[in-house]
Amino acid sequence: MAPPAYAAINKLCNDLLQRDFPVGATLLSVRTTAPNGVVFNVSGNQDAKGVISGKLETSFNDKANGLTISQGWTTANVLESKVGLSEQFAPGLHLNVNTTFSPATAAKTAILNLEHQHPLIHTHASVNALERKFLGDFTVGHEGFLAGAEFGYDVQKGNVSNYAATIGYLASPLSVALQASNNLSVFRASYYHRVSSDVEAGGNVTWDAASTANAITLELASKYALDKDTFVKGKINSAGVATLSYFQTVRPGVTVGLGLQLDTQRLGQPAHKAGLSLAFSA
């Protein structure tokens, strides 16, 4: 089995800290699958100011030929297209092209991604064809121990735009990582622990060496499955902001989520947020 992609080394911790917290917005998602495998996905978001944004996306996956195609259209009038090929040119090689186009402004992007997976190394390269920028990363792994690096290069300016490095350990039920990002100026240590089949815990500590405040930020989170259809999550950071969420599958294909964010340093002020998430699938 190949080591994870560089961007996914901290995935377990990041998902625990960032996903399933619908605060400050109302989220709606409707996903349906046709008999021929075509998937339709409509998603919408209304923020605290009442601004609504959304996207309609259609995708198709031809597993026999390793082909995936998707087309999306957003309420910002942006067309998003993705085409991917897997395992067609070499074992473990994945290729995809992502493009966007705005009919109103003629703004466009075109990004080519190449990814290769090997039992000992996972490599990835991304080329922004229009802006002439390159991003590359790799992860090497052995018996759960991981090491990786990332760097960006601006062809027009002829210089390295950014670089980062990560070391970690990943073996169920534990994951730990130490990352230096933003040109090795921001340091982050994180952990994830599946305590039991029902309980997950994780957190991170971050230090920005370039910041004049010289402060360390801390964030902790946990998830508890009440039953197979219901779970609750909670997190709190060093600024005293606590966030809670509750998700329940009320019936097959229908999931409801509630979120609440409290600023414990300003309990008597209007600094708190609530949110709702509705997801339908068929």
From Swiss-Prot:
InterPro entries: Porin_dom_sf (IPR023614), Porin_Euk (IPR001925), Porin_Euk/Tom40 (IPR027246). ATP binds at K11, R19. The keyword Kinase does not apply. One of its GO terms (biological process) is mitochondrial transmembrane transport. This is Non-selective voltage-gated ion channel. It is found in: Mitochondrion outer membrane. It comes from Schizosaccharomyces pombe (strain 972 / ATCC 24843) (Fission yeast). One of its GO terms (cellular component) is mitochondrial outer membrane. Belongs to the eukaryotic mitochondrial porin family. It comes from the Eukaryota. Non-selective voltage-gated ion channel that mediates the transport of anions and cations through the mitochondrion outer membrane. The channel adopts an open conformation at low or zero membrane potential and a closed conformation at potentials above 30-40 mV. The open state has a weak anion selectivity whereas the closed state is cation-selective. Catalyzes the scrambling of phospholipids across the outer mitochondrial membrane; the mechanism is unrelated to channel activity and is capable of translocating both anionic and zwitterionic phospholipids. CDD domains: Porin3_VDAC. Consists mainly of membrane-spanning sided beta-sheets. GO terms for molecular function: ATP binding; porin activity; voltage-gated monoatomic anion channel activity. Keywords: ATP-binding, Ion transport, Lipid transport, Membrane, Mitochondrion, Mitochondrion outer membrane, Nucleotide-binding, Porin, Transmembrane, Transmembrane beta strand, Transport.
